[in-house]
Regions:
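Conserved SAM-binding strand-loop segment of SAM-dependent methyltransferases
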Residues: 99-114
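A short glycine-rich, Lys/Arg-flanked "PGG" loop and its adjoining helix->strand segment in the class I
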Residues: 138-151
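Conserved class I S-adenosyl-L-methionine
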Residues: 153-205
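Conserved SAM-binding loop of SAM-dependent methyltransferases across substrates and taxa
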Residues: 64-77
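Long, charge-rich, low-complexity alpha-helical segments
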Residues: 257-291, 295, 337-403
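A short acidic, Gly/Pro-enriched loop at the edge of an enzyme's catalytic core
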Residues: 113-125
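Conserved alpha-helix/loop element of class I SAM-dependent methyltransferases that forms part
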Residues: 16-56, 70
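Conserved SAM/SAH-binding beta-strand->alpha-helix loop
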Residues: 86-88
Length: 403
């Protein structure tokens, strides 16, 4: 029997339980919310060697109720194509397209596995929270890879295994109870969550999940008929299995260790491969419930996107504040936390303007009389450590200079 994604149980799910919550006020929503893969705010993580290009071709693969419209609204010169298996989700997209005059938005009821039928290729493909619901995630990613231009980027979000341990425990409970995707089952889910002990493994997830207020959000999280979670190794295996290469984590901080240089833990970690270090840290930073990462074709020149702090050429990198990041007095602010700075680290970050290279910044800081004790060699090593750390903590993106 031929598998038809449009008559699959996942398609039935999203026809009945429209998800995520429909947005009716796009500019109002965007005042305090954003899409991490939006090139308007994240292009530097996709293409570190070039500035934002307004008129790119974007595919939102599994656009849900709002995502393609958000991209089209935020990037008015881009051509945005949204595909989804849910007619209900696309109906709301049609409303947003008409209401906001999104002439740059094209919509299709189409499964990811059949994206080839568009006969199009794209600069940026975004599949956020979708591949982990497919019957065959590898086939889905292979299909997307076939529609990616040679220097294009695919942005992917997948469920992270260890941050969803509590979710998976409750999913198993609700399966044992014989719950379905109906209103009585949703009420039982609410009763169980309300009665959970404070130390239940799902508690940390409940604290960060923003969509559990709605019935559709509860169904999507706890009563989904098909989803799976991925480890770091699973993510990289999926990428290589699709004939692609792993470009980078879009959100890197969950995979970084917090201990200072010289600790025994860091010494032991340094003996591991990069992938092994990420794997260790996902089990330590176990609250992380989603992997956000980028991937690209194998033949894309690595010098156009690989950020390298290991060689002395790191001084040519140009640091830029990432979206919603800034320095206020001595506090480095991110959208979700604050890092106090002082001494040389503060002096270095104060010189970041999105135009100066690390080499330029070192030169300016070396002229600071208050840091007279820092010689050029020490300052270079400190700069490497400071900017590598703040890049890994998602405060900075790095531009690759073409000069």
């Amino acid at each position: 029997m031929t598998f038809d994604p449009l008559s699959d149980m996942v398609s039935d799910h999203y026809e009945k339980w429209v998800y995520p919550d429909p947005i009716f006020d796009l500019p109002g929503w965007m005042a305090n919310n954003w899409q991490w893969f939006d090139p308007r705010i994240s292009h530097r993580m996709f293409w570190p060697d070039r500035d934002y290009v307004a008129d790119i071709d974007i595919l939102i693969a599994g656009c849900g109720t709002n995502q393609a419209a958000v991209f089209a609204y935020a990037n008015p010169q881009a051509s945005v194509v949204g595909i989804d298996i849910s007619r209900s989700s696309l109906d709301h997209h049609d409303y947003l397209k008409s209401h906001y005059g999104l002439t740059n938005l094209e919509l299709h009821q189409l499964p990811i596995e059949e994206v080839h039928s568009l006969n199009r290729d794209f600069d940026l493909i975004v599949s956020s929270g979708v591949l982990h619901h497919l019957a065959d995630p590898l086939l889905g990613l292979q299909s997307l890879a076939a529609s990616l231009r040679p220097d294009g980027v695919i942005g992917i979000m997948l469920y992270a295994k260890y941050g969803r341990v509590g979710v998976e425990m409750l999913q198993a409970v609700f399966r044992d109870l014989g719950l379905g995707q109906d209103q009585p089952s949703v009420e039982i889910v609410r009763e169980v969550i309300a009665a959970l002990p404070a130390d239940h493994p799902v508690t940390s997830y409940l604290g960060i999940a923003s969509d559990l207020h709605s019935d559709a959000g509860l169904v999507d999280t706890f009563l989904h008929r098909r989803d799976r979670s991925f480890t770091v190794d699973d993510c990289l295996d999926l990428v290589t299995g699709a004939g692609l290469v792993f470009q980078d984590w879009l959100l890197k901080s969950p995979y970084q260790h917090p201990l200072t240089s010289g600790s025994q833990f860091q010494t032991s970690m340094s003996e591991l491969s990069q992938q092994q270090q990420w794997s260790v840290m996902e089990r330590i930073n176990a609250r992380n419930a989603c992997h956000f990462f980028t991937t690209c074709h194998e033949n894309r020149p690595t010098q156009t996107y690989r950020i390298d702090f290991e060689t002395d050429a790191f001084i040519d990198l140009i640091p830029e504040f990432r979206y919603r990041c800034e320095l206020v007095d001595t506090q480095l602010l991110r959208h979700d936390w604050t890092l106090p700075l002082g001494g040389v680290a503060l002096a270095l970050v104060e010189q970041v303007d999105g135009e100066r290279s690390i080499s330029d910044i070192i030169s300016r800081v070396s002229d600071d009389p208050s840091l007279a004790g820092e010689n050029q060699s020490t300052l270079s090593d400190t700069s490497r450590n400071v900017f590598r750390s703040l890049w890994n903590l998602d405060f900075f993106a790095m531009r690759i200079s073409n000069s």
